[in-house]
């Protein structure tokens, strides 16, 4: 199977999971990125079962609305049973690097209030140690250089994310992103807390404190379901 076929496979598997585990009339939390888009496309076929969705980005909101799925502001929702999203990397504990699509802050907010985080990914995203994929850090623009110095002191290589025309990439929240190369993150939870404590960091794309509860992993032999201990 191609990577796109694996993404569609796990997108459908996530929709099947929601149908089997989330009652009708609920609101679904939805992530951002190409794999999350496959879930949205599969969810559209059963959209009548659910009130709608909470979105983690403007791009996801647009795709949900294109399928006629109602989008709620998180502040309107009392509880969220499930959040479905992809990952750039996931380790054996369910800790992830996320934010390749630029939506890490809103993804982390929505994930934090969901009862269950379902990660959907192809098998290439499963790694023994996080860090081969550059770690995104969303920063207040004036703190960009200061945060870069802190990253360098820890052995990382900070790279400002830019658009095709070379301008700084701006998140939905009006901030910038530093992508950090060259890390091997042996303690994801500790490193997440350390970076989040730096003044000027909005959030780091480590999802360890709130990792995945389960992962639907697309493999050439089908979908593998991995459940992580609480």
Curated annotation (Swiss-Prot):
Transmembrane segments: none annotated. Coiled coil: none annotated. InterPro entries: NagB/RpiA_transferase-like, Ribose5P_isomerase_typA_subgr, Ribose5P_isomerase_type_A. Substrate binds at residues 32-35, 85-88, 98-101, 125. It comes from the Bacteria. PANTHER family: RIBOSE-5-PHOSPHATE ISOMERASE. Catalyzes the reversible conversion of ribose-5-phosphate to ribulose 5-phosphate. This is Ribose-5-phosphate isomerase A. The lineage of its organism: Bacteria, Pseudomonadati, Pseudomonadota, Betaproteobacteria, Burkholderiales.
């Amino acid at each position: 199977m191609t990577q796109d076929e694996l993404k569609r496979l796990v997108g459908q598997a996530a929709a099947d999971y929601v149908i089997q585990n989330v009652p009708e009339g609920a609101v679904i939390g939805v992530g951002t990125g190409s794999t999350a888009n496959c879930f949205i496309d599969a969810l559209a076929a059963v959209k009548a079962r659910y009130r709608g969705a909470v979105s983690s980005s403007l791009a996801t909101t647009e795709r949900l609305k294109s399928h006629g799925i109602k989008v709620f502001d998180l502040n309107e929702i009392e509880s969220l049973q499930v959040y479905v999203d992809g990952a750039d990397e996931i380790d054996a504990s369910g800790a992830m690097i996320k934010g390749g699509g630029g939506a890490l802050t809103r993804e982390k907010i929505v994930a934090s209030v969901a009862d269950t985080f379902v990660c959907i990914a192809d098998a290439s995203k499963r790694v023994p140690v996080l860090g081969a994929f550059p770690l995104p850090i969303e920063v207040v623009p004036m703190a960009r250089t200061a945060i870069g110095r802190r990253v360098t002191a820890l052995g990382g290589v900070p790279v400002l994310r830019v658009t095709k025309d070379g301008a700084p990439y701006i998140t939905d929240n009006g901030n910038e992103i530093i992508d950090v190369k060259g890390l091997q993150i042996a303690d994801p939870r500790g490193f997440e807390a350390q970076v989040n404590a730096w003044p000027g960091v909005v959030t780091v794309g480590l999802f360890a404190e709130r990792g995945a509860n389960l992962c639907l992993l697309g493999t050439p032999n089908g979908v593998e379901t991995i459940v992580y201990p609480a």
